Amino acid sequence: MLARGWLESPADPLSGPWTFHDDFNLGSASIPVLVVDVNRDGLNDLIVGSAHGYGLDWYEQRLGAHGERAWIKHPIDPFNSQYHDIQWVDLDGDGQCELVTGKRYRAHNGHDAGEFDGVGVYYFKWNGESFSKQVIDYGPAGIGKGCGITFAVADLHGNGRLDVVAPGKDGLYVYENLGG
């Protein structure tokens, strides 16, 4: 996966040329770019955060009648910036994955869009047509907690529920999943 397309491996990925497909332009995409079948149509889609601008989007993959590939950009959250790490996990235990992420604060000390905006940790639930935003934490820096470059999702208490561990500019925070 590259910002302007993807590489298709040959039959033997250790020898032979890889084929570049110039199918899309992800701009200043964060790392990672998630490759998941968001809408469950059997085709892999892309989920991309903007690490240094505004926006969190998913790119729906569609195939035309003759196999031509198209990528349709859908906004998930165009109103927040500095989405770095994103994870696709079943946070609420319903058997369906949610998109978990957070907004970073002052990523490059005065050089990124929205650097002084409120920070937060969120998950986005897919309803079959679009994502709905669920707030885990939000507020101005010092009150709300965001995510740094990376965060972790794990069952810290052995209760079967995934918790979120979010490092930020003002410390490390654990969000215990109380269920319900």
Language model features: what each stretch is:
Residues 1-180:
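Beta-propeller-forming repeat regions
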